[in-house]
C-alpha cells in the first residue's frame, strides 16, 4: 500500500528551515512515495529543499486559482508574461515555436489551448525538481467531463506523457463519473492513476459511495484514496481497513497522522 502526501497545507505555513526538516522527516518516517504540490512559483525554493532531502514531488497543474487571481490583478496578458519570464531560457525559445500553429486558437481565446500552455509553463518550471509524475487538477478534469470536452483532456494527457515523459495522475472529485466518461471517450485508463476521496463514511465520494467503490473494485484503474479520515473525523485504525479492502493502490497520508 503506497502512501502519498500533500504539501499544500504545509507550505502555507513554512517559514523556518526547522519546519521544512520536520516535514521531510515526517514523510520519510511514513515512507511517503510521492508528495503532491499545487504549483506556486513563490514556494519553489522550499519545494526544492524538500526534494533535496530525498522526497519525490509531483506537481498539480495547472493552478487555475492562482491564474485567476493574477488575471484579476492585471489581465490575462500580464499573467501569462509573468509566468513566461520565470521559464528556463531554453523553454522561452521553444514554447512560442511549438505553439506557433495555435496562434489563431489563442487569438480566439481557446480555453483548452490556454489550459495546455499554462500547464506546460508550470511543468517546465518543475523539471529541475526531477519530477516523474504530474497530477492534472480536478478543476480541469471535472470541468472537461461536465462539458463533455474530450479534446481538453486528450491535449493535457499528450502534454504530460509525450512532451514531458511523465506518468499521469487524474485528480477528480467525481470518481464514478470521471472514470466512466474517460472509458467512454476511448482513453486507455489503465495507464492512469486516479486521486479521489475514498472513505468509509462516503464523504466526498461522488456520484455515490457505491459508484466509487465499484470503480475501485473493477481492476480497470488504479486509485489513490484521498480524505480517508474525513478530515480527522475517522481514526486511521477504522479508515485504513476500508480502503485496503477496496484494493486501492494507496492513500494520502492524513494531516492528523504525525
Each predicted region: which residue ranges?
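N-terminal binding-site loop/beta-alpha segment at the start of enzyme catalytic domains
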Residues: 1-54, 239-242
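Alpha/beta enzyme core
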Residues: 17-30, 83-86, 103-136, 142, ...
Amino acid at each position: 500500500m503506497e502512501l502519498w502526501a500533500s504539501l499544500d497545507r504545509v507550505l502555507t505555513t513554512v517559514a523556518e528551515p526547522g519546519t521544512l526538516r520536520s516535514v521531510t522527516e515526517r514523510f520519510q518516517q511514513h515512507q511517503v512515495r510521492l508528495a503532491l504540490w499545487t504549483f506556486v512559483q513563490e514556494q519553489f525554493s522550499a519545494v526544492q529543499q524538500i526534494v533535496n532531502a530525498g522526497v519525490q514531488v509531483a506537481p498539480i497543474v495547472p493552478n487555475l486559482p492562482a491564474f485567476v487571481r493574477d488575471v484579476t490583478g492585471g489581465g490575462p496578458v500580464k499573467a501569462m508574461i509573468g509566468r513566461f519570464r520565470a521559464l528556463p531560457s531554453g523553454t522561452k525559445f521553444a514554447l512560442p515555436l511549438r505553439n506557433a500553429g495555435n496562434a489563431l486558437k489563442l487569438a480566439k481565446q481557446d480555453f483548452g489551448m490556454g489550459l495546455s500552455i499554462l500547464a506546460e509553463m508550470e511543468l517546465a518550471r518543475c523539471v529541475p525538481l526531477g519530477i516523474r509524475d504530474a497530477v492534472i487538477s480536478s478543476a480541469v478534469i471535472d470541468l472537461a467531463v461536465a462539458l463533455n470536452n474530450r479534446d481538453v483532456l486528450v491535449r493535457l494527457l499528450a502534454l504530460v506523457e509525450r512532451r514531458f515523459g511523465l506518468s499521469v495522475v487524474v485528480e477528480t472529485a467525481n470518481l464514478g463519473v470521471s472514470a466512466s466518461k474517460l472509458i467512454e471517450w476511448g482513453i486507455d485508463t489503465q495507464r492512469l492513476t486516479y486521486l479521489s476521496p475514498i472513505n468509509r463514511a462516503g464523504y466526498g465520494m461522488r456520484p455515490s459511495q457505491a459508484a466509487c467503490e465499484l470503480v475501485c473494485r473493477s481492476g480497470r484503474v488504479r486509485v489513490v484514496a484521498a480524505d480517508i479520515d474525513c478530515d480527522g473525523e475517522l481514526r486511521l485504525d477504522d479508515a485504513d481497513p476500508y480502503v485496503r479492502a477496496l484494493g486501492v493502490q494507496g492513500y494520502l497520508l492524513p494531516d492528523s497522522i504525525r
